[in-house]
């Protein structure tokens, strides 16, 4: 990591965090960060490699960024993508202020004093002037097209909740990064997982002394690139000249055949009969084993068919909202747990050796210092996460169970990305809902459930 790569990476992260809201809600050109492989990052990287980096190399060789430096910058950018959009910015501020607003509007909330069930540290402190603070947040302080000054924001009411939420998020983020150092060697060296997105990125990055990656010198790449570019550009221009150009359909519509597969439709599989051609997915499939691609393609059909069969017997898997107690969530939770158990069993010798080296004990295997330090960071950060849940009122047993479920989700999603390159992953597993379903509302109590669901 060079100094300029650190500065450029940090600047890129700050730009993403600041520009995302403007792009999504002012320009309204679609989600700036739409999935786990954002076009905002990889598209910019492609343009930089094709245009800017060769130009920098022509001006002065040392100005061109190396592959290692670009990897650092991309890493910063990807981490920053977790902050705006669906991440921290859209969830936490609204989640800790909106309950105050809803209590004023909903008679049921007011009758039971719903916000009193949440610990004070988890919500904003509006005791000074609740009417003004809550109304200003709900309606906004800006008038017309005029923007407000940062000084007009009542920062003091946000200090208490942010003092809880930011350390909580940082503990989980730092802990999972440490865990990634532990898993990486086992997954990449011992199990030889394909890492499709990483391999794709590495193919783009230039080697030492070059401005372009090796893939840009391949004729097959340019043929495929130009064909896809022409198709997408034609479809874009069709939005402006609809009467002149003919769009190329990027989907196959088999929905008229739905009467032939009523069981699939009953299992909410109708949209599977209208598959969309995603060129990114097609490209990443070349990095995978054929059986993995086959499983990814036909797995949803099998799941929806089974769901349709169960629905005919009155067993509905998909019902309620995403954090409700439903059978589908428990199916996924069981599957996630099974995957994590398989991961630990497969690398049990390595993980046990890392754990021993973490505490300074000897092990028969050669363990990289980074893995041992990663385990130490993970254990400390996880302990910090559990401690903060206990401080706000969660029993230590539930805090440990909740944290374990969170880690199961992160490990499973990470394993899926490393093994398949899937970048559209919408998990249906929420720790609060799973614990609620297992123990019941009576055993947990309202305050405990509020804490778990707010953290979810």
Predicted region positions:
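Transmembrane-helix bundle segments that line or gate the permeation/cavity pathway
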Residues: 3-456
């Amino acid at each position: 990591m060079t100094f300029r790569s650190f500065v450029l990476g940090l600047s890129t992260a700050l730009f993403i965090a600041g520009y995302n809201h403007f792009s999504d809600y002012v320009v309204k050109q679609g989600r700036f960060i739409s999935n786990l492989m954002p076009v905002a990052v990889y598209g910019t990287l492609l343009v930089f490699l094709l245009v800017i980096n060769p130009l920098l190399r022509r001006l002065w060789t040392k100005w061109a960024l190396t592959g290692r430096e670009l990897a650092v910058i991309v890493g910063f950018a990807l981490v920053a993508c977790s902050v705006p959009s669906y991440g921290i910015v859209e969830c936490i501020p609204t989640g800790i202020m909106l309950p105050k607003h809803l209590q004023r509007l909903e008679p049921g909330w007011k009758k039971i004093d719903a916000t009193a069930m949440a610990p004070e540290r988890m919500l904003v402190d509006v005791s000074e002037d609740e009417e003004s603070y809550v109304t200003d947040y709900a309606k906004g302080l800006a008038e017309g097209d005029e923007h407000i000054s940062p000084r007009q924001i009542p920062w003091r009411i946000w200090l208490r909740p942010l003092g809880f939420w930011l350390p909580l998020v940082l503990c989980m983020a730092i802990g999972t990064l440490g865990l990634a150092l532990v898993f990486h060697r086992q997954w990449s060296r011992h199990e030889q997982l394909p890492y499709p997105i990483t391999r794709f990125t590495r193919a783009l990055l230039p080697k030492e002394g070059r401005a372009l990656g090796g893939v840009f010198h391949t004729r097959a790449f340019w043929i495929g690139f130009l064909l896809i570019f022409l198709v997408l550009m034609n479809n874009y221009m069709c939005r402006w000249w609809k009467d002149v150009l003919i769009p190329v359909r990027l989907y196959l519509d088999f929905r008229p055949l739905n009467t032939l597969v009523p069981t699939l439709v009953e299992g909410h599989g109708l949209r599977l009969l209208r598959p969309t051609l995603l060129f990114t997915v097609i490209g990443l499939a070349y990095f995978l084993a054929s059986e993995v691609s086959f499983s990814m393609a036909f797995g949803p059909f099998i799941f929806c068919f089974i769901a349709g069969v169960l629905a005919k017997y009155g067993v509905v898997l998909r019902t309620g909202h995403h954090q409700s107690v439903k059978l589908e969530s428990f199916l996924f939770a069981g599957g996630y747990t099974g995957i994590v158990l398989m991961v630990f069993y497969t690398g049990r010798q390595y993980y046990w050796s890392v754990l021993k080296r973490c505490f300074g004990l000897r092990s028969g295997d050669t363990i990289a210092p980074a893995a041992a330090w990663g385990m130490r960071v993970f254990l400390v950060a996880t302990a910090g996460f559990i401690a903060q849940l206990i401080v706000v009122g969660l029993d230590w047993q539930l805090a440990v169970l909740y944290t374990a479920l969170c880690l199961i989700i992160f490990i499973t999603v990470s394993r899926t990305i490393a093994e398949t390159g899937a970048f559209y992953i919408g998990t249906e597993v929420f720790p609060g809902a799973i614990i609620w379903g297992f123990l019941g509302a009576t055993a947990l109590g309202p305050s405990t459930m509020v804490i778990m669901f707010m953290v979810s």
